[in-house]
């Protein structure tokens, strides 16, 4: 129950950040289109800082075992959920924004603050493992889907700053190389912008929307149901059947981090990618807002379900 309360408090805090972005545009200080600059800063600067900084921890065999367990759970979920969402998209005739909003969770923006507040800073690394796995899918499948490109540009994927950051973080961890303290502090400071910056962008986009149309759009509620209820339930079933929880003494806590990453609202990165690649960013933002709003109720309930089932 305590974890559920902490979740509600954290999500409420994110909503206040969205409100700030909304007010900035409504008062005329900035325009909605100005959010594109912030989006690029988040995608190409803030997220890489978060990833590299997260891997700056002491190397131990136990740590490696825990990381591999979380990695296995993350890949397992991403692969199975991708197949499930792809099938649902075909049957339900969902467009690119809808399928990516259902599949991609807001782990990039939420998992770090959520894990920090709920479990402690020392557990953030494991959240970043899931985030890194999702990042690979996001910049391959996600980017290809949203941009409607027929082929993957492997050079852009391999040399993408986010992919490079994942590789750099892993290499630094396994080679036991620690960056100078001033560098780590800088990475940590910049990385702390991830939640506020992403939520402010969402608020700025909302300011130019017809909010009435968002709440009257039945399709948005349906997409939110798939993102916040169906995906988490399927994920919980997969984690339970996999038996991964029995591999480690802290298995339940480690898998909770993975589960927390899965049950978050739709990824705000989808909105940012839609802006960059010319898709429907306003619709993506509407789904993000609705799922974030409803997640105040669904996330605590899903955590309670996890604690009961696992």
Please provide the spans of the model-predicted regions.
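Alpha-helical transmembrane segments of multi-pass small-molecule/ion transporters
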Residues: 1-310
């Amino acid at each position: 129950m305590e974890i559920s309360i902490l979740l509600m408090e954290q999500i409420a805090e994110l909503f206040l950040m969205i409100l700030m972005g909304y007010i900035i545009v409504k008062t005329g200080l900035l325009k909605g289109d100005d959010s594109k600059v912030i989006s690029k800063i988040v995608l190409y600067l803030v997220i890489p800082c978060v990833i590299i900084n997260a891997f700056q921890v002491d190397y131990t065999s136990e740590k490696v075992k825990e990381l591999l367990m979380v990695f296995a759970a993350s890949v397992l979920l991403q692969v199975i959920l991708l197949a499930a969402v792809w099938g649902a998209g075909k049957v339900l005739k969902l467009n690119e924004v809808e399928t990516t909003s259902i599949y991609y969770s807001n782990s990039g923006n939420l998992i770090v603050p959520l894990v920090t507040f709920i479990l402690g800073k020392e557990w953030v690394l494991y959240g970043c493992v899931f985030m890194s796995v999702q990042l690979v899918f996001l910049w391959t499948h996600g980017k290809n889907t949203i941009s409607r490109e027929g082929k993957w540009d492997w050079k852009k994927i391999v040399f993408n700053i986010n992919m490079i950051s994942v590789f750099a973080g892993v290499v630094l961890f396994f080679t036991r190389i620690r960056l100078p303290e001033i560098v780590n502090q800088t990475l940590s400071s910049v990385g702390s912008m991830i939640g506020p910056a992403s939520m402010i962008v969402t608020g700025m986009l909302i300011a130019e929307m017809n909010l009435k149309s968002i709440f009257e759009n039945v399709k948005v509620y349906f997409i939110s149901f798939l993102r916040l209820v169906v995906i988490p339930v399927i994920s919980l079933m997969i984690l339970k059947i996999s038996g991964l929880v029995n591999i480690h003494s802290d298995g339940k806590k480690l898998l909770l981090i993975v589960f927390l990453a899965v049950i978050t609202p739709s990824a705000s990165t989808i909105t940012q990618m839609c802006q960059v690649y010319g898709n429907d960013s306003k619709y993506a933002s509407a789904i993000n807002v609705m799922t974030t709003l409803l997640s105040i109720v669904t996330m605590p309930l899903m955590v309670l379900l996890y604690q009961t089932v696992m």
